[in-house]
Structure formats: structure tokens, C-alpha cells
């Protein structure tokens, strides 16, 4: 519980900064039904309930050389596999960086050795609602061919792909 409370402290610190810096209490977020307001409520609830998450995973990397900006990338595929497996079993998961604000205290509490980087904080549990379909941007807007901004001809969305709202609206405008 002590670790979860510590991560919750980091989560509150990060969310309080982000909510102000990204305008989660101003602009469109003032409207209760706006996507930004819904996201802010979700984050408030997530951060408030952080000490109660059923499973908390710290993705760590044992360093074999000097730290570099790309080193965490070797941990993220494992984190992604964990999240995919959790979803396949009906669980929800979130990859965060909440450990960053309390890393020194975490290291002491968990006796994480020097030379080991904490690269990710992952929470897992049963979702409050149902998993909906995964929505994303069309592949041609994410994968370019020979020229930047020009969708690769082979980047074709699989049948049944659902796109995020802003892409659905774009399609309606055309």
C-alpha cells in the first residue's frame, strides 16, 4: 500500500500540473459535456483512486552503459505486450510516468539498485465500464511512403477499423 500511495502522490503532482498547463479547467473543458471535461473527470477519478488499483507494475531496465534518451524503448515493447494480454483477458491497463515525481522515494522503499532505471508505471484492473472498440487515426495519416505527409499506398486499414471522432468528422466534410 505504501508504494501505491507514493505513486498516487506522484500522480496527483503530475495531474495538477498537466490539468493547468493543458487547460483542463478552462476553455472547452468548462462545458460539462465536452470531451476535455470528460477526460478531466476520468483523470481526477483515476488519480484519486490510485491507491486502490488492484495491480501496479513498474517497468524497469537494468542499465549496462551510461543512461541515454532511448534506453526506455527496450522496456516499452514488454509493457505493450502486458497491456495487450490484459485487454485480451478482459482487464484494463494504463501506462504512465507517475513514478517520475517520486522516483527517489520509490527507489529507497523498493531497494531498487543504482544502474536500474524505472521506465514505466502500469496500473491494471477490471474496467469500470466495458472495453469499447479501439479507435485510431487512419493508417494513411500515420504511415508515409516516399514523401512526408503522403500516405503509403500499402497502408490500408483492416476491415472494420473504427476511427477517432475527428477523422469521422473530416470524412463527413469531404
Q: Predicted segment positions?
A:
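Alpha-helix initiation and N-capping motif
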Residues: 1-4, 103, 115
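Short gly/pro-enriched beta-turn/loop segments at secondary-structure junctions
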Residues: 50-53, 88-89, 117
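Generic alpha-helical structural context detector
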Residues: 5-12, 84, 120-123
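Glycine-rich, charged/polar anion/phosphate-binding loops
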Residues: 41-44, 106-109, 129-130
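Glycine/small-residue-rich phosphate/adenosyl-binding loop
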Residues: 1-75
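A glycine-rich helix N-cap at a beta->alpha junction
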Residues: 15-26, 110-135
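Small-aliphatic-rich amphipathic alpha-helix that forms the alpha element of a beta-alpha
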Residues: 57-109
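C-terminal helix-cap and adjacent tail motif
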Residues: 119-174
Amino acid at each position: 500500500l505504501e508504494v501505491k500511495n507514493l505513486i498516487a502522490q506522484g500522480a496527483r503532482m503530475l495531474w495538477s500540473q498537466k490539468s493547468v498547463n493543458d487547460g483542463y479547467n478552462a476553455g472547452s473543458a468548462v462545458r460539462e459535456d465536452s470531451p476535455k471535461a470528460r477526460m478531466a473527470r476520468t483523470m481526477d477519478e483515476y488519480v484519486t483512486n490510485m491507491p486502490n488499483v488492484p495491480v501496479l507494475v513498474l517497468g524497469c531496465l537494468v542499465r549496462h552503459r551510461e543512461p541515454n534518451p532511448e534506453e526506455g524503448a527496450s522496456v516499452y515493447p514488454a509493457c505493450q505486450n502486458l497491456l495487450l494480454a490484459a485487454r485480451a483477458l478482459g482487464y484494463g491497463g494504463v501506462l504512465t510516468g507517475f513514478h517520475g515525481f517520486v522516483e527517489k522515494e520509490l527507489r529507497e522503499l523498493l531497494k531498487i539498485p543504482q544502474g536500474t532505471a524505472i521506465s514505466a508505471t502500469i496500473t491494471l484492473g477490471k474496467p469500470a465500464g466495458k472495453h469499447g472498440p479501439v479507435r485510431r487515426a487512419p493508417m494513411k495519416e500515420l504511415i508515409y511512403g516516399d514523401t512526408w505527409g503522403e500516405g503509403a499506398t500499402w497502408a490500408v486499414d483492416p476491415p472494420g477499423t473504427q476511427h477517432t471522432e475527428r477523422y469521422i468528422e473530416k470524412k463527413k466534410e469531404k
